[in-house]
Amino acid sequence: MPSYQFPDDFQWGAATAAYQIEGAASEDGRKPSVWDSFSAIAGRTLNGDSGAIACDHYHRYESDVKLMVELGIRHYRFSIAWPRIVPDGRGSVNEAGVDFYKRLVDCLIRHGITPHATLFHWDSPQALEDQYGSWRNRQIAHDFAEYVSAIVSRLGDRVQHWMTINEIPCFTHLGYSANQTPPHAPGTRVGSSKEVWQTSHHALLAHGLACQAIRAASPGPCSVSLVDNIAVTVPITESEADIAAAQQAFPHCWLNGGIVFPALTGAYHAGFLEQLGSAAPEIQTGDLEIIHQPLDRLGLNIYTGTYVRAIDQAPGYECLDLPQGYPRLHMPWLNFVPECLYWGIRHISETVGRPDLPIWITENGCAAQDVLDAKGEVIDTDRILYLRQHLRAAQRAVAEGYPLKGYFVWSLMDNFEWAWGYDRRFGIVYTDYRTQQRIPKASFGWYAECIRQNRVV
């Protein structure tokens, strides 16, 4: 029987995001983000929920870090709220906001946990939306780089591992739309698909300028990465033909050819640009050089995948619909395709052509229909099933020599799930939002045992 063992230096961690857990939305100089404003619009989030209080992590971080110690992780991925650091998006730095992250990081380090800081996880300052329309304007890339310089120069003596931006597609192509009101903040309708693609191009520019800013501002050695939620094409059989079809489909699946390809290769995928036609963004001279910064690692957020097979007509592949009754977790898009972790990693090395680039799974997990039983426990065996099968796929990638170096479960605790409010629970710790009590679920103990044994149990 396979042991599903990981290398001794494999990094086990957990991940969160600022707006989803911190709360304290108007404390210590923080000003509104686009998510504060979006959540205040009737009907935009389920039950009118917002992140104003969330998990109150801002006040409870010390006890949350103790949970991490109990779990056994040595790596924690969190995000820094731009509106806490530069409340107006540009200009003066709010040192009280910086001090919170200093306290958090110091607490992590005292407990032997390495901090991994994401500099942007969707909560851009509302002031920049009011001033020039956020990601519709190239100026945001420069303002983001200034904010990055400010926080890295202040935290770089404590934090070595920096992630620039989390999931560009979600706050651009799910936040802007030409023909409908988009589901994500700031929920902006624009005039054309080209304008939507311009927002993601500006986000790529922000990533590139942030890479430069991190390396210029860091007082010591640092590691720089991007976090992308690639769409993963999975061959329905591992025949030579179906593998080739999945690789052929990968640049054309969702936004891959226009996000991960320019970031990692310095060019939008040629076939993808042709597919976009007049919707392709305007690319100014020098943009691609800025976007294509050297990375020390790549973070992949992977939850599901799309099955693909070879066909005998153009384009040579077919993306397959899933049948009615196919297993799914507690989100409409969260189909159970555990091979996605293996193929996502393999596609970066082979399909994108970056076998040199170390990879971390920076998010993987699932929403489940968690309830407290009569004993006050959450026995989330569905989540354990999901995580076990995905981690087996990750271990396969390691065993075959692909450069997977670490894994961060999403998420440490139940939290504000964006437009779904508090209805969907992704945590391995149950959050009672009324009392702010934290209750480790069965999956918490299971994951702790994986970490303890350094293998999939």
Residues covered by each model-derived region:
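Active-site region of glycoside hydrolase catalytic domains
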Residues: 1-45, 69, 88-90, 98-457
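A common structural microfeature
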Residues: 9-11, 58, 75
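Active-site mouth loops of central-metabolism enzymes
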Residues: 46-60, 136-138
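Internal amphipathic alpha-helical repeat/solenoid segments
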Residues: 57-66, 87, 97
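Catalytic domains of carbohydrate-active enzymes, especially glycoside hydrolases
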Residues: 60-81, 293, 297, 351
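Glycine-rich, proline-tolerant flexible connector loops at the mouths of alpha/beta enzymes
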Residues: 80-93
